[in-house]
Amino acid sequence: MEKNLYIVRCGEVALKGMNKPYFERVLLERVKNALSCYEGAEAKWIEGLMFVRVPANIPEDEVISKCVIVFGVASVSPAVEAPKDINEIGAKAAEFMQKVIETDNIKTFKVKGKRADKSFAIESPEIARQVGGMVLKACKVLSVDVHRPDCVLNVDVRREGAYIFRDKIRGFGGLPLGTNGKGLILMSGGIDSPVAAFMMAKRGMSIEAVHFHSYPYTSQRAQRKVEELVRTLAGYMGTVKMHVINLLPIQEEIVKNCPEDETTLLVRRFMMRIAEQIALKNRCMMLITGEDLGQVASQTAEALVVTDSVVEMPVMRPLIAMDKVDIMDKAREIGTYDISIQPYEDCCTVFLPKHPVTKPKKERIERSESALDVETLVKNAVESEEIVEIRP
């Protein structure tokens, strides 16, 4: 079976010390899993690069799109292989460039040579010079431009053979999924929390989600929107378990017994307590939120301190110092933005106070909570959870 070759490069994995073989093994399995839909696809590490071979009838763009979304992959290049003979390399390079001319209508190029195998007699600059000369001879429409070429042709000579490629298509980088424990994301239907989940997954963390709703004040459509967001994320991280909690009984107790301006913060503290219990039951190491410092009243520095005081588990906030515009750009990049802006309500908009407290005092909030049976409310909420497994 004829197969096309792709060179996959890792990012931070290459910088690991004694643990590098573990990270490489996990990344290899992730790439193999991404390509498992193609019968005959194979991948293996050779001298710090991953060589992927996929049946030639599979479109190049399709293979690349599956590889670049694997966390830990820094870049991917479609490539061709040649024997370690300079004339053979030059012939393959010329053939490669003829195809590039046909598809991209380029006029100028340069060759970058790399001699990773030091036993190869010809040094890197001379590889570039000789291969460039052979390409010029075979491709009359081309000229050399070493400063601003339309195309850079890379020739990498290694122990296993010589490899010729053009583009390095960027991947997300980061660390392979599952190499950094598991976290629980508090998932709303907004823009921020899906981006926060993505960013933690990119750092190698497996993700579960908890979603709070206030049915019947919030609709089934609102929950389906969240499920669609999680399904989009599952395209990057595999099946995601989502825990669904009806927060309405707690909200009604807060509205009935506590000051109006504290409603949002009190609800947030209950969310954190419930999320921590769910995280502990499911062996999650930390909570994750999409909070961004100062964005809304519940995300001021004072409010975050009061919110965090009810849990012992670490709380990760990967967006905390990002501008909203940058968060929105990332949401567009990962495909969640258009879903997030659908105009369906979520539990945070139910019983929203007109003037929420922005600089809360912990002692005052705790006094307000003393009017509530916090332990029972949390226990009932956790016991009423529904679990939805969302696949890509």
What are these model-derived regions, one by one?
Residues 295, 343-351:
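Small/polar glycine-rich anion-binding or flexible loop at a beta-alpha turn
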Residues 1-184, 194-240, 309, 357-362, ...:
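RNA-binding accessory domains that recognize and position tRNA/RNA substrates
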Residues 145, 243-245, 316:
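General small-molecule cofactor/ligand-binding pocket signal
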Residues 335-343:
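A short alpha-helix-loop-beta-strand transition element characteristic
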Residues 167, 210-212, 245-248, 289-290, ...:
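Generic beta-strand/beta-sheet core signal
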Residues 230-256, 346:
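A conserved beta-strand->alpha-helix junction
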Residues 130-135, 168-180, 251-334, 377-389:
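Active-site adenylate/phosphate-handling loop in enzymes that bind or generate adenylated species
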